[in-house]
């Protein structure tokens, strides 16, 4: 859906938004079972989805956590949803459709994040970089997507002048997500712990097709032209990873 808005086809994104909105119903079941976050009748306390979904309510990780567990997928979807407003400026749609979705997703992460004292971060845990490497806490992929979600949620809530208490809680965690770090080779870290002697490089491929740790560069807005060191590290990351991969990852790298 990346081209839908930029090609002036925002109306083609509405079925996607409706699909995600409907997914929240079953996603609340997944949030209860996998994260202990319960929404009783009429409540919208958080929903969960991973790398697979169907029109029939599939929101669980699948049969292999290595590629299936991806709780920040809900945050990534919200970026596509919020983009509708950024391109159309439809205030009614923002208030009635988009904001409730953003709010519930932000509430999930406000509850699900764990504080890691060693790194002074609020982290996603457990955390997999999609189909690559080992399990960690607070990897760059998850942290970047939650950063984007919280950024967008606070922007909308402040614009609508609503839910000040939740915004305050989200802001406190947002400031300690700390998604971007540069490793000793001058590249963006994919895993926070990767320079540690205890870090295992099991399953790591230098030319892996995904560059999940650059999700904040595209399609996210985490990187800034005023942060030259991160942009140079991102360039080094792309050069190191190479141009191989399947269709989706090639499009991601090109963008």
Task: Go through the PLM ranges and name each one.
Residues 49-69, 125-139, 199-200:
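Acidic/His metal-coordination segments adjacent to aromatic residues that form catalytic metal sites
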């Amino acid at each position: 859906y990346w081209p839908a808005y930029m090609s002036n086809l925002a109306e083609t994104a509405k079925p996607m938004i409706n699909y995600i909105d409907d997914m929240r119903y079953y996603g609340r079941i997944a949030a209860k079972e996998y994260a202990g976050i319960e929404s009783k009748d009429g409540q919208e306390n958080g929903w969960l989805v991973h790398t697979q979904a169907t029109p029939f309510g599939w929101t669980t990780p699948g049969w292999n956590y290595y590629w299936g567990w991806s709780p920040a997928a809900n945050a990534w979807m919200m970026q596509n949803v919020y983009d509708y407003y950024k391109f159309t400026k439809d205030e009614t749609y923002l208030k009635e459709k988009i904001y409730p979705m953003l709010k519930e997703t932000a509430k999930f992460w406000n509850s699900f994040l764990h504080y890691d004292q060693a790194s002074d971060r609020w982290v996603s845990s457990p955390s997999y970089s999609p189909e690559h490497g080992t399990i960690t806490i607070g990897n760059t992929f998850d942290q970047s997507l939650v950063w984007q979600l919280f950024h967008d949620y606070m922007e909308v809530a402040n614009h609508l002048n609503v839910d000040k208490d939740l915004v305050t809680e989200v802001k406190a965690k947002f400031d300690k997500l700390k998604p971007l770090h540069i490793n000793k080779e001058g590249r963006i870290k994919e895993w926070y712990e990767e320079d540690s002697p205890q870090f295992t490089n099991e399953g790591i491929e230098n030319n892996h097709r995904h560059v999940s740790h650059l999700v904040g560069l595209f399609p996210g807005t985490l990187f800034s032209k005023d942060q030259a060191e991160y942009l140079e590290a991102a360039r080094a990351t792309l050069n190191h990873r190479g141009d191989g991969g399947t269709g989706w990852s090639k499009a991601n790298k090109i963008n």
